[in-house]
Amino acid sequence: MVQSPMISCPLKQTNEIDWIQPLKDYIRQSYGEDPERYSQECATLNRLRQDMRGAGKDSATGRDLLYRYYGQLELLDLRFPVDENHIKISFTWYDAFTHKPTSQYSLAFEKASIIFNISAVLSCHAANQNRADDIGLKTAYHNFQASAGMFTYINENFLHAPSTDLNRETVKTLINITLAQGQEVFLEKQIMDHKKAGFLAKLASQASYLYAQAIEGTQEHAKGIFDKSWVTLLQVKSAHMGSVASYYQALADGESGSHGVAVARLQLAEKHSTSALSWAKSLPSSISPNTNLTSEAGPSLVDIVKFHLANVQSQLATFVKDNDFIYHQPVPSEAGLSAVSKLPAAKAIPVSELYQGQDIQRIIGPDIFQKLVPMSVTETASLYDEEKAKLIRAETEKVETADGEMAASLDYFKLPGSLNILKGGMDQEVMVDEEFQRWCQELAGHDSFAKAFDTLQDRKSEVLATLDQCAKQLDLEESVCEKMRSKYGADWSQQPSSRLNMTLRNDIRTYRDTVHEASASDAQLSATLRQYESDFDEMRSAGETDEADVLFQRAMIKAGSKQGKTKNGVTSPYSATEGSLLDDVYDDGVPSVAEQIARVESILKKLNLVKRERTQVLKDLKEKVRNDDISNVLILNKKSITGQESQLFEAELEKFHPHQMRIVQANHKQTALMKELTKTYGDLLQDKRVRAEQSKYESITRQRNSVMARYKKIYDSFNNLGSGIKQAQTFYAEMTETVDSLKKNVDTFINNRRSEGAQLLGQIEREKAAGTSDHEEREREKLRQLMERLSTEPKPPSVPPGSSTAGPAKAKSPPPPVKAPAYPTNIAPPKASPHFAPTVPQQHGTPVSHSPAPYSQYVPPGAGVSYLPSQSFQQGAAAPLSEGYNPMAYPIPASSMSPPPSQPFYSPTPTPFYTSPTPPVPSGQYMPQGYVPPPPPPRPQQPTYPPSTGPFPSGPGGYAQSRPYGSSQHHKAHSQSSPQTGPSVSANSSDPWAGLNAWK
């Protein structure tokens, strides 16, 4: 397959500079050291820049050279100020697109240019990959995202671009191009993996959007910067990706049944593809080398677009034809189509993740100027950071411990909630609960469950009635078969029904057991309804009349609350004459309850102030520690602090001592206040009126909890009942569908057995007629031989074996082939049964039974039972019938039936005609002609069956698992009319096949 051409960014070029002398000058001036000691380090940095200039644009090695130089610049920036006022080096870089030179003394400009080249190398490496190979495809996908990440880093960290290629809008356009190409590469992989059409459409839509964004950038913000071939290529890619998105979305719409919308999307895809083809043809054959595109880019794009356009047009013709002749759905206009959803699969990889999983230190190398600015300084700073972290952890633990002690003490005293009770706030405890109101509102307007239960009972009765009807039909058919076997003996070679209808009977029994199991669940639901029906009615009425508070108050009264009239006429646990504890006045000099409560509240306020102050102090301490930086101190004292780091750390940590002391003082103050609170509140609780009030509150609380628990149980029962009824409705709906499908299979089985029996009966009668003439011939031969023995005349000479003279003992020629019975032409022909070729060869001149071809596809191999040593029978085998045969002429006797007699032998079923012998097929469970496998009954647990090795998966009972179709009026009418056979049956009930005599 032709590979789509990709755009790669050109690299910036730079002039050679000298790092050595400026660095040596700065070392001499600022550090006071001999610069010659660092000659090797300066030369190493200078060589890194020279190597970076010659880095290959499409290899991982070039990327690593650029990144190594960039990493050393980052380390250098921590030690040497490279700018116009300190280390003055002119960095000259040429614009990647306009080739104009730009010179600056800023190290940031040097680093931005290096990152730009890293991005360009990544994009080149990605564009040159062979994406037909899985490794190449993954490499291209990763590198396009990494390139976008490096360009993003430029836009976020270098705000003032000195050149056009580093301009924010230019870089943003490059980001969109690389991300769009990464999205396209990911789409190619998903198309090769044959993912779902809807998923592919979203990926293509995102790619088209990114290419459109890139086009907008080239035309509005970066106009004239990029080569025209780039703009044309972006136009092709945008239109092509839009066509791909519409194409796959059309396929998805077609799969979902929206054929008219699919046609409209294919028309849109054709439009986009035609536009893309026009743009692709406009690509020039000779392209500038600076674009990194080859001369094959144009022809490759033309081939890709043409191939896709052919697919679109082919699918469009198919969809239009299907919609015109089958679906007849309206085709919306292009404006009426919804946009295809976008799914981003390519994201910019951050710089920090460029070498994820690799040893970055190995790529960057050791710090070149480690001797000048030792890394030990950094290590010492890390040790100091750990000391600060220890301090913060210790102070945080003190604050959390104090807060926990306060919370535990207040919770033990039930403060401040208990003060509200003592001040008369207990009336709130008898107000209706919001949750209770919500329960009543949810029950409001809900219909009674009785109607739903009646419907369930009706559905269950219908299911059981259908199952009973199926069982009766099978019993009737089996009885008829065995009566014919009793009448004709060994000549009646039709297989016993008991083995053929085993699957159907098992299904009937299984479904009936399932319904009986469901009846137990129905009984549980009914018991729940009887238990809580009155409560449901109360809550429903309260919700509809907005009197939930009345119901709640009544429930509280029943639970044992004290009584006193309220405005609603309902009793309340408080009486208006009781008054409040705050109204009590003591004359013996003891503080009143109100005064004691005020003292407790005052202490609580002080405790809250202490807690807030302590929390704020800890917050300030953390902020100060986070902003503390002693790097300069460590650098200035790097020679004097060797071995004395701990003393330096202690001196530096002293700046946090005031905050530590404030936390300690707050903890001491809290301890004193808690002691005072314990004494004051204890005295308050010892007051007789307070103790009585508290006892009353506890009683009301228990009553309230009891009421809420009761109605919570009622509410849960209501929800569970509703959920259970929905599950039951779903169960019986599925069960009805399953049983209707079973009924169709039973009808099909009965019809096939009737046809087979009628054909066998005709065969037996023809053989009897032929057998009568043969018997007369044998009697004449016996009489002639007897006369010869009694005769006194000499016997004539014997005839040699090879003589052509015909003797009396001439062997009989084989009987002529049995012809299909002829039926009167004056009878209106019913629907003809399907005609099938025999599948079992005829052996030893004996006609055998053949199964219709469609049966075998439902029979699992290896599951059959052989009835005769010399041949195998398929269960449910029916002899093929003539085209004009009416299978419904097989009557069903209306009289009661006796149990089928057991037969010790089985004979092959005669067949009226024979085609070509085929190998015998192992028999399996009988599957009637036209058998529609019913779905398994909706039970809580399904039995596990061994996997089928046949052409179709098998489910319970060996059925092929397919979706059963529901019942229809035709089948219902057929099942009701089938037992009515006509007067001939009632006239001769002893012979169930008597009705067939009228056909001759």
From Swiss-Prot:
Residues 840-849, 981-991 have a biased composition (Polar residues). It holds the Pfam family ALIX_LYPXL_bnd. Residues 732-793 form a coiled coil. InterPro entries: ALIX_V_dom, BRO1_dom, BRO1_sf. Residues 898-922, 931-954 have a biased composition (Pro residues). The keyword Cytoplasm applies. Residues 764-792 have a biased composition (Basic and acidic residues). Keywords: Coiled coil, Cytoplasm, Endosome, Protein transport, Transport. Residues 5-406 form the BRO1 domain. SMART domains: BRO1. GO terms for cellular component: endosome. One of its GO terms (biological process) is protein transport to vacuole involved in ubiquitin-dependent protein catabolic process via the multivesicular body sorting pathway. The keyword Cytoplasm applies. This is Vacuolar protein-sorting protein bro1. Involved in concentration and sorting of cargo proteins of the multivesicular body (MVB) for incorporation into intralumenal vesicles. It is found in: Cytoplasm; Endosome. Belongs to the BRO1 family. Residues 760-857, 891-1000 are annotated as: Disordered.
